[in-house]
Amino acid sequence: MILDAKNLAMPPRLLPVSFTIDAGEIVHFIGPNGSGKSTAISMLSGLFEGQGEITFMGQLLSDYDLPSLARMRCYLSQQDRPAFSVAVYHYLALSLSALNNPRVDHVQHALDEICQALNITDKLNRNIQTLSGGEWQRVRLAAACLQVWPAINPEATLLILDEPAAALDIGQEAAMYKLIRRMAEQGIAVVMANHDLNRTLREADKVLLLNNGSCVVKGSPSDVMTVEQLESTFATQVQRIEHEGRSCLIFND
């Protein structure tokens, strides 16, 4: 276990919720808009104060200084664009600033792998202000993964993503989830707020379903994402079908 959250809360946006996160685990927070997903995962970053207690790698999260946190975890908030103009490669280099002198060849190998996975290799010399929304989001994802890539940052343990698929098309989204699974296979725990319930059903190891600031249920995708619980939480009709050995959710008006 790398993280233990007890009675995490920021009333009224988030009421007390407790959960644990293991190394290499992919955890999805799902729920309607305003349910508390972003609030919950933002508190795991150590940048926002609230109620409750978070133990991270055996130590209270509040006891870490920011440079230590920057080496151990990365937090990608919802899409924003800085007010300065730099090339993409320069922006990506900023994600390495907190690391302890990683080897140049290891950094280059990690950069090549991540950029190829997200199909942004041809964007490295572009100015970030000239990128489309989807291109910019992929650059942000690349920077986040680079910061906690184990081969160049052995202290890394946690990647926190707030709605990372925003602005991505279906092919780019598929590539992102493949990269997230690659991170998890290297032992990085990935925590994310997500709206694509079919992706959560397929990709998550653990799910927390939130509504009106409260955790309705938590557990495996099959236990949490029942038709009854989804219909009650999202106030819409839901069907769950099997297609080619895979469960799919269909939402009816």
From Swiss-Prot:
PROSITE patterns: ABC_TRANSPORTER_2. The keyword Transferase does not apply. GO terms for molecular function: ABC-type vitamin B12 transporter activity; ATP binding; ATP hydrolysis activity. It is a peripheral membrane protein. Keywords: ATP-binding, Cell inner membrane, Cell membrane, Membrane, Nucleotide-binding, Translocase, Transport. The complex is composed of two ATP-binding proteins (BtuD), two transmembrane proteins (BtuC) and a solute-binding protein (BtuF). This is Vitamin B12 import ATP-binding protein BtuD. It comes from Photobacterium profundum (strain SS9).
